[in-house]
Design a protein with these regions (language model features):
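Aromatic (Trp/Tyr/Phe) and Gly/Pro-enriched flexible surface segments
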Residues: 1-121, 125, 129-182
Length: 182
């Protein structure tokens, strides 16, 4: 019999919140990897996460070629409100309080201007802005909420995007954590 570990007692309830698990990125591909929406690929290439859109993609980037807030990989939301990064997190308890924390930044790809992410969990929503100079960098943000079900849907959606040299760019999301508050 194997021992079960309760994620609410040991740390992060989000699966692959650091985005370290995902498709292989070849070292000679400085543009990252475009990940298709779940409608095109029932089994998401980003374990734990669904890419929700009719036709748009997200960009999976690496620290070798981009600014990544933590670790070696992150996700850049390049299609604005037309795509969302979603995870159904099991194990939440209705009526209990939780904190969702994450990093938002830019990929050091020349994307200049105001970048924004709308984040949703349970009945709460928060828009987080990041003023990008296009040279890399990030800031940490959080959303506190009270669970309304045994499973909580966590959603990240870019509130805007930009174009640099005919290439879409947007906010980078990384280091996603969900913990129960005492």
């Amino acid at each position: 019999m194997s021992a079960r570990i309760n994620p609410t007692l040991t740390g992060n309830m989000v699966k692959n919140g650091d985005f370290e698990q995902g498709p292989y990125i070849f070292s000679n591909t400085p543009w990252g990897a475009l990940l298709p929406p779940i409608l095109e690929d029932v089994h998401s290439p980003l374990p734990g996460w669904m890419i929700m859109s009719g036709t748009k993609v997200v960009k999976y980037i690496d620290a070798q070629h981009h600014a990544v807030p933590k670790g070696a990989r992150a996700v850049e939301l390049v299609a604005g409100v037309e795509v969302a990064l979603v995870q159904e997190v099991p194990g939440t308890v209705p009526g209990r309080s939780y904190r969702l924390s994450f990093s938002i930044g830019d990929a050091r790809n020349g994307c200049v201007g105001s970048l924004g992410v709308d984040v949703y969990a349970a009945r709460e929503r928060r828009r987080v802005s990041y003023e990008s100079r296009g040279t890399g960098g990030h800031k940490c943000a959080k959303l506190e909420f009270t669970a309304i079900a045994n499973k909580t849907r966590v959603v990240f959606q870019s509130s805007n995007h930009h174009t640099v040299n005919a290439t879409l760019c947007g906010p980078v999301v990384d280091d996603v954590w969900l913990v129960r508050l005492k």
